[in-house]
Every structure is written in C-alpha cells, then in structure tokens.
Amino acid sequence: MKKISLIIPCYNEAPALPLFAKELNKVITQMNKETHDYSFEVLLIDDGSTDETKDVMKDLCHRSNLCENPSDARPSATDKTTSNKTAVSDASFPENIAYKYISFSRNFGKEAAMYAGFSNASGDYVAVMDADLQDPPTLLPEMIHILETEDYESVATRRVTRKGEPPIRSFFARQFYKLINKISDANVVDGARDFRLMKREMVDAILAMSEYNRFSKGIFGWIGFKTKWIEFENVNRIAGETKWSFFGLFKYAVNGIINFSETPMSVASSFGIFCTILSFAMLLFFFIRKLIFGDPVAGWPSLVCIILFIAGLQFLCMGIMGKYIAKTYTEVKERPHYIVSDSDIEDIKKIK
C-alpha cells in the first residue's frame, strides 16, 4: 500500500479547515470504493496562527485517530470552540487517513511551512494544498492516476482564469511570470499553483536545496523533473480572508526574481557603464563647443535634473545590490527555517 502525504500550510484558517477536511475525506471515501491501494497522511502546518486554527487541527487529528483506534475516545481538544467543533464533527473520516499537526512558535511564512511539511512527510507521493479549497481535492484522484500510469515525476496545477481576483492584481501577476521566465533559469508557469503531487525523488531534491530564502515555484521549476500540468477554473476561497496583500505579493515577486536571477545586478552594472560613457561624451561635447563657438554652458535647471537623474539611478542600483547582499547575509547566518512549539509527531525536529 502506497502512502500519500498531503501538506496543508495554515495561517488563521480555523473557519476553512473543517470544510477542507470534510471535502478531502469525501474524495478519499469515494476513492476507497474503487481501490484500497493508498493510505493518506495529512500534515497540517500551523504557521503561528492567532485564531483557533491550532485547536481545530488538534480536533481533526483526534477524530482521525479515533477512526484508527476507536478505544482511544476522549474529550475533543476543541470542545470549547463550539462552531468549529460542530463543523469538524460533521466530517466523516475514512480509516486510511491520518491527520497530524505541526505548530510553529511564530509566523515564519508559507515557504517555511511547506519546507516543514516536506521535511516530515513520509509518503511515497507528496502533495501541497491550500486549506481554503482554492486547490480542489477532487483533482487528487486524477493526479494520482497520472503518476501511477504515465512517465511523470510530478503532476502540477495551474489556473486558466483569475475570476474573482482584482484586475490590477491579475495584470501584475501575468507580467511577473513573463519577466521571471525571461531573466531566470527556472521555468515558472503562468497561473501555477503550489498544488502539485510529487514522487519521493522530487521531494528529496527539494529538501537538498536547503537555502533560507525560499521561492518554491522557482525551486519546482529549477530542479527540472518531468511534470504534467492540469488546468482548472479559478475557485474562490471557501471561508476566511486572503493573507496576501498587494505589497506582500510584490515583495514575494521581488524575492523570487532575486533568488533565481542575476539579471538585476547585470542591469545595474549596465546602467553604471552607460552613465559613465554618457558623462564623458557630454564633457567632450561641451568642451569642443566652448573651443569652437565660445558658447557658455548655461542652464542650471538642466544640470540639476541630470544630477537628480544620475543620483536616482545610483540609489536604484545600490538598492538592488543591497537586496542581494541582504539575501547573502541571511544565508550566512544559517538561522533555522522554523521552530516547532507543538506537534503530535513523536520524532519531529523542533528546530530546522
């Protein structure tokens, strides 16, 4: 029997988690009617949530454990959170699914949560999914079938529409994908989700890339395993609110470009060379003009504009170089990707 590990990063997803579990359990129950060749491990990663997410996780783990060991019945961890408890109790748990949780000491970010999931997943196949049901669990059977029957190491998903997303956000997202594919050596598909199912060898390759500044979409493309893409219509989140602001997405995009491309540094160097050549050309022009025509070089406003323009370019280039230096600095410090404060996984590494 093959084991499939599902990594679910969560940040303030208490309202969505019970609905996600209910939908996932329904899909697995339907699969069990056709085959009993798979067991499922669901790793719920609490990324320093400030709501009841951790309690809901514990309740899900407890209830899935009861399906495997009915004699272990005891009070639920979330009896005090009645609304979420009721939603969790509505979910029917198949016997071949085990929920486990990992809770961080603070918010380390989705990339750290995914890395924690990869580090602790024990399945033959490993998938990453969002808890808000924007990654439809109904695609899992098809993804599993493709890995089992076709010559692929990964099955990934991409949105073909951005229905429900602000137009300006959609525009900048499309431009980002075009830009990063032109200037980097990582193939990042437009509309790609983190939702993908991978064989163990691909997961091991991801774990071998242990850098602190992570951009998983770039890592998935950089390691180069054969991937089949499944397209689907955009799905709105089932509950809660998005954690990604426009500024947060912009910062994420900048980090992705810096992590997988040296082009910004090359552009900064080119600007420096261009400005140097231009300044020498202007000096030569004004010198010859003075010698031949005797014209005075007047116009302090134009001089101020030129100085400000050059200064702006210099600060831009310094900022680009500063970003690379800052990334190098964080890598050299070798701080842990995350710190675990609580988990029901016995042999988990608390700091990694």
Predicted region positions:
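Short, well-formed alpha-helical segments that are part of the catalytic scaffolds
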Residues: E13-N32
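Conserved donor nucleotide-binding strand/loop of the catalytic core
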Residues: K54-R74, D79-K80, N84-N120, R158
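Short beta-strand/loop segment that forms part of the nucleotide-sugar
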Residues: N32-G48, I102-S103
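Acceptor/aglycone-binding surface of glycosyltransferases and processive sugar-polymer synthases
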Residues: A98-R106, K110-N120, Y125, P137-I219, ...
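A conserved acidic beta->alpha catalytic loop
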Residues: D46-D55, L133-Q134
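Hydrophobic helical membrane-anchoring modules
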Residues: K217-K352
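Cell-envelope/extracellular polymer assembly enzymes that use nucleotide-activated donors
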Residues: K3-S5, E41
